[in-house]
């Protein structure tokens, strides 16, 4: 089983699709592609067996949204208290 939710080019899509179609790999979960959105005629994973594909939304769980909101509120509170966090120096 292979899961890629990092970056599309990390995995060779054609090789992964071949491994899935030939039964050398049991399954794959893919949330990222070489081309976003994937082009149907040129993305072999769209036709591969045992591939679970999502449209680059692996980050969008309820837990991650709640955590992100908490971080935003903490950053606003810190800024208003005169103690900004994660300051970018340019």
Where are these regions (language model features)?
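Short glycine-centered segments of the SAM/dcSAM-binding site in methyltransferase folds
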Residues: 1
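Rossmann-like dinucleotide-binding domain for NAD(H)/NADP(H)
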Residues: 5-90
